[in-house]
Amino acid sequence: MVVGDIATGTELLVIGAGPGGYVAAIRAAQNGIDTTLVEKDAYGGTCLNYGCIPSKALITGANLAHEAGNAEEMGIHADPVVDMSQLRDWKSGVVDQLTGGVEKLCKANGVNLVEGTARFKDENAVRIAHGGEGQGSETIEFEHCIIATGSRVIQIPGFDFGDEPVWSSRDALEADTVPERLVVVGGGYIGMELSTTFAKLGADVTVVEMLDDILPGYESDVARVVRKRAEELGIDMHLGEGASGWREEDDGIMVTTETEDGEENEYRADKVLVAVGRSPVTDTMDIENAGLEADDRGFLSVDDRRRTDVEHIYAVGDVVEDTPMLAHVASKEGIVAAEHVAGEPVAFDSQAVPAAVFTDPEIGTVGMTEADAEEAGFTPVVGQMPFRASGRALTTNHADGFVRVVADEESGFVLGAQIVGPEASELIAELAFAIEMGATLEDVASTIHTHPTLAEAVMEAAENALGQAIHTLNR
């Protein structure tokens, strides 16, 4: 048993071992900095353990089952049975492999790993509480610190995640049975990904969204493609309704909603999944002791080096204001912060940040929309290629959606792109690279793309913007 407070020191302290924290720690150690990484739960953070990775594993299983059971047109007749316990075990195996890999990578790069919960004592020291009662604590003094504590799911009034019928996204990913009836509160990207997944696994799914469309933040024609497919999967969509509560009934639960006009509606379910967003975790570390102050939503303000108002303390990932809550953003911010600590002349550039939604079909976006470009003072030119004109898309039997490229008419520089369709999450990387390297429409259009591939649609969209498309009518 460890008693008392042990004092140690480190050049760089990183709090949180998610995709922002562990990447920052490894990069700092690679630059010769004495680095200590503190984690209270599991290496890899929410993304690897309770979010991105397990959800994509579950989506893969649901897609395989659905494809196998809906391929009569190809002459394939099957009635697959999904063993949810076995699917969950496979998913957990993937997660365990990756979390173990993160820990090994940190150790191999010379990062000092500490398990516990960090609270600031002042602007140059934290107290680490190790586990439960009697396991002791230590004080770690630091020259620099990176806060990478991530975010937690938002809980709304009337829906306590401690109640058995109420699921958070984490609960949904741990399910060992498929509910017969599932109400999903929230039509954002998490809600729509899980709605689609459970519908494919056999649940009768109802989505309740308080706004007038699903997928806020994405263009309406992109959301329309996903909404149409969701309805084809049997998902019942109710827009303009906010969830107000639930009650137990003899045969399950009843979820109550209310419209802006005060009209109440009720939906019967076995489980209700609340997926209305996430909030930053900055309220558990006594940040005020370090001279830091979060805004009224809990976010920290940083500069383009990811420095907070206390210059030797950095923040990356979901705790940072005005940046998207995306794992790859956190990782890039972590690299920027670590390299700045090492004295490198770096800065975070957000103009080419891709985002993906793993619905059916998938969504991939990067950079500016046409409206964004106009607002920024550009005269945009837009090219679009429907997947129904793609031979490869047709051979996959998934040809809904399109690739759209936005460019500056005068210079030809690619400014942004929106993709909704098969493998959009993969295809968007080409256009993120185009923006990052300053490519023009001509660069993209003149690059020979393999045939037959989905990526040809990117080339054709650029050709369409130039008025040179072959396989679709020029705009």
UniProtKB/Swiss-Prot annotation:
A single cellular component GO annotation: cytoplasm
Pfam families: Pyr_redox_2 (PF07992), Pyr_redox_dim (PF02852)
UniProt key word Nucleotide-binding: no
Listed cofactors: FAD
Main location: cytoplasm
PROSITE patterns noted in UniProt: PYRIDINE_REDOX_1
A GO BP annotation: 2-oxoglutarate metabolic process
GO molecular function, one term: dihydrolipoyl dehydrogenase (NADH) activity
InterPro entries: Class-I_Pyr_Nuc-Dis_Oxidored, FAD/NAD-bd_sf, FAD/NAD-binding_dom, FAD/NAD-linked_Rdtase_dimer_sf, Lipoamide_DH, Pyr_nuc-diS_OxRdtase, Pyr_nucl-diS_OxRdtase_dimer, Pyr_OxRdtase_I_AS
Binding residues for NAD(+): 186-190, 209, 275-278
Alphabetic keyword roster: Cytoplasm, Disulfide bond, FAD, Flavoprotein, NAD, Oxidoreductase, Redox-active center
Catalytic activity: N(6)-[(R)-dihydrolipoyl]-L-lysyl-[protein] + NAD(+) = N(6)-[(R)-lipoyl]-L-lysyl-[protein] + NADH + H(+)
Record keyword Membrane present: no
Location of the protein in the cell: Cytoplasm
Enzyme Commission number, as recorded: 1.8.1.4
Disulphide-bridged cysteine pairs: 47-52
UniProt: FAD binding residues: 39-47, 56, 118, 318, 327
Active-site residues from the entry: 451
Record text on cofactor binding: Binds 1 FAD per subunit.
Family: Belongs to the class-I pyridine nucleotide-disulfide oxidoreductase family.
SUBUNIT field: Homodimer.
Record's miscellaneous remark: The active site is a redox-active disulfide bond.
Name of the featured protein: Dihydrolipoyl dehydrogenase
